[in-house]
Amino acid sequence: MSLMNKAVSRFRTAGWLEKAGYSPWLYLYRNLERGQVMYSQLPEYGERNIKTQFKRHQWENKTPSLRRDIWRVMCVVQMPNHQDSVQVYQNLCRLRYMRDVLYREEAQKHRKLNDKGQVWYSGQYRPTYTQEAVADLKESIDKSGSAGPVTLVWEDMWRMGERSVWEELDLEIKHRALPKLGNVIRDEHAMLKQLQLESLE
């Protein structure tokens, strides 16, 4: 693992993030090949994100690659302060561990399965994982204790699911769309930097 990968994927405290000048945000990255979702506290990700969030390598949920061309930002979660952003990140990681390790059999019962009892897929892509990540994001924000407001910036607005589900939360949540990308790798970095600049205005 490179030193850069170690640096960007290490867990960060609220104090560190604030001192380093990062906005109180977290990032959900979608795997274009398999539908898996990875969480990051920084607008980057590394090997440790993979190792800590994908604990159980198996045929239905193989440990994903770090290749930059297969990950795209699905959602940028803009929390009101760094403590809230860290709490939501920790909640997401705990829910992932519960789904994949502690209560895997129970979680499987609620997933769309094919006639062989496997998580439904098309090619290698399993939409269940992105749907679960959105559900877990809602739960994580709800349990964070945040007073809001929270802004969710989506890759596509339809990924948020039903707006009425988000309106159940007892805090102000705004939804908007990320700018459309051309060259995914180059433009995505520029777009995330632009979001950071907008937050400082």
UniProtKB/Swiss-Prot annotation:
One GO location term (cellular component): nucleus
Entry keywords, A to Z: Mitochondrion, Nucleus, Ribonucleoprotein, Ribosomal protein, Transcription, Transcription regulation
Record localization: Nucleus; Mitochondrion
Keyword Zinc among UniProt keywords: no
Top-level division of the source organism's lineage: Eukaryota
InterPro entries named in the record: Ribosomal_mL67
Principal place of residence: nucleus
KW Transcription regulation (keyword) present: yes
Gene Ontology MF terms in the entry: DNA strand exchange activity; single-stranded DNA binding; structural constituent of ribosome
Leader peptide range in chain numbering: none
GO biological-process terms attached to the record: cellular response to oxidative stress; mitochondrial genome maintenance; positive regulation of mitochondrial DNA replication; regulation of DNA-templated transcription
Similarity comment: Belongs to the mitochondrion-specific ribosomal protein mL67 family.
Purpose of the protein: Transcription factor involved in regulation of RNA polymerase II-dependent transcription. Also involved in regulation of mitochondrial DNA recombination, maintenance and repair, and generation of homoplasmic cells.
Name of protein: Large ribosomal subunit protein mL67
Organism: Candida glabrata (strain ATCC 2001 / BCRC 20586 / JCM 3761 / NBRC 0622 / NRRL Y-65 / CBS 138)
Gene designation: MHR1
